[in-house]
Amino acid sequence: MKNEKLYREALQVMPGGVNSPVRAFKAVGGKPIFLVKGRGPRVWDAEGNEYIDFLASWGAIILGHAPKKVVKAVQEEAEKGLSFGLTNPHEVTLAKLVVEMVPSVEKVRFVNSGTEATMSAVRLARGVTGRKYIVKFEGCYHGHYDSLLVSAGSGVATFGIPGTPGIPEEIAKLTIVLPYNDVQALEEAFKEYGSEIAGVIVEPIAGNMGVVPPKKEFLIRLRELTKEYGSLLMFDEVITGFRLSKGGAQELFGIEPDITCLGKILGGGLPVGAYGGRREIMERVAPEGEVYQAGTLAGNPLAMVSGSETLKDLRDKEPYKELEEKMEKLARGVKDILTEKGIQHTINKVGSMMTVFFTDKKVVDFQTAKTSDTELFAKFFRALLNKGVLIPPSQFEAWFLTTAHEEEVIDEALERIRDAVKEL
């Protein structure tokens, strides 16, 4: 069946024809493609077109598509049952792996998505501290939970305004929004509201304004201030968890938060989220404590098996140096191609994730990220897609590599990108 026919049918039964807005390709133009198969570093659409995949399910895939060991384990588990509604042994296996691999986590609670993880972490921070305000940073996305789907107004430290209809202003005002990487704004906010701040949630490496690394002093000062004022520091490692190192960004930077939110790679391609932290904090979660959170499908056995097999592979093989070297090769190649064409650009990368911004400015926060030429990005995206290279259909997202992206695949992708850029 053709992509366009599928899209027309989807429009009749799903809002915008999709189950997540970015999939509609509104930011890049053209009709969305429908993917039907993935193997290793490649995916195929409903028309049989093949793409080298740098979307990697928005970073959820790190071993390549359909890794045999993971697929086999899931198939075997599926034969035993799809969901039980009570605790299964695989939850214990995955929880032990998370505690082993993530430095700050002593206990962990599984949920079904990154949004559930951040939502639950915020509730826990408020429950533990008895305070109401949450600090987030402009351009950092933490799922579609009411308290976190807010944008900043003008000024250094602003109370949030709703980022979408359906969020009451009264709820949004409980979130203080600050510029990412701005230590002075952070200090001013704590000076004014510190005794009322329950917690600070941050992507330790921003991935939803494109890849924006933190300034060294930013995370250090963030940790110092939260300790000083008795607020909880929450790292949203839904993207960075298990991608940059087996212990995520917190291991990379040597900074331990109070609560860590996980997702994406944690499920090995199946829907899983989690939040975890120090024992005394997590023991405030029901049924041990009074902070309530629950889920019918939380700890689903298929997702637990998929996640466990994925984390075991990452723990045992630690492919991170190799992934970083491959991303360096890809980034250098893309930079050379764009430079030869005379296209202004900035490439930000950390480990196996990168973003190409079409701006001559150094991108250090959401405001500088927004200087990127989004119209040029849309043309770039469509040109790459036509040549068989799939990147995220948004300027403000990351490209990802998997262990299945061998050197020759990178070379092949760069040739396709070179051909595509010639047409810009």
Curated annotation (Swiss-Prot):
<dbReference type="InterPro" id="IPR005814">
    <property type="entry name" value="Aminotrans_3"/>
</dbReference>
<feature type="modified residue" description="N6-(pyridoxal phosphate)lysine">
    <location>
        <position position="264"/>
    </location>
</feature>
<protein>
    <recommendedName>
        <fullName>Glutamate-1-semialdehyde 2,1-aminomutase</fullName>
        <ecNumber>5.4.3.8</ecNumber>
    </recommendedName>
</protein>
<dbReference type="GO" id="GO:0030170">
    <property type="term" value="F:pyridoxal phosphate binding"/>
</dbReference>
<dbReference type="Pfam" id="PF00202">
    <property type="entry name" value="Aminotran_3"/>
</dbReference>
<dbReference type="InterPro" id="IPR015424">
    <property type="entry name" value="PyrdxlP-dep_Trfase"/>
</dbReference>
<comment type="subunit">
    <text>Homodimer.</text>
</comment>
<dbReference type="GO" id="GO:0006782">
    <property type="term" value="P:protoporphyrinogen IX biosynthetic process"/>
</dbReference>
<keyword id="KW-0663">Pyridoxal phosphate</keyword>
<dbReference type="InterPro" id="IPR015421">
    <property type="entry name" value="PyrdxlP-dep_Trfase_major"/>
</dbReference>
<dbReference type="InterPro" id="IPR004639">
    <property type="entry name" value="4pyrrol_synth_GluAld_NH2Trfase"/>
</dbReference>
<dbReference type="InterPro" id="IPR049704">
    <property type="entry name" value="Aminotrans_3_PPA_site"/>
</dbReference>
<dbReference type="GO" id="GO:0042286">
    <property type="term" value="F:glutamate-1-semialdehyde 2,1-aminomutase activity"/>
</dbReference>
<dbReference type="GO" id="GO:0008483">
    <property type="term" value="F:transaminase activity"/>
</dbReference>
<dbReference type="InterPro" id="IPR015422">
    <property type="entry name" value="PyrdxlP-dep_Trfase_small"/>
</dbReference>
<keyword id="KW-0627">Porphyrin biosynthesis</keyword>
<keyword id="KW-0963">Cytoplasm</keyword>
<comment type="pathway">
    <text>Porphyrin-containing compound metabolism; protoporphyrin-IX biosynthesis; 5-aminolevulinate from L-glutamyl-tRNA(Glu): step 2/2.</text>
</comment>
<comment type="similarity">
    <text>Belongs to the class-III pyridoxal-phosphate-dependent aminotransferase family. HemL subfamily.</text>
</comment>
<keyword id="KW-0413">Isomerase</keyword>
<dbReference type="GO" id="GO:0005737">
    <property type="term" value="C:cytoplasm"/>
</dbReference>
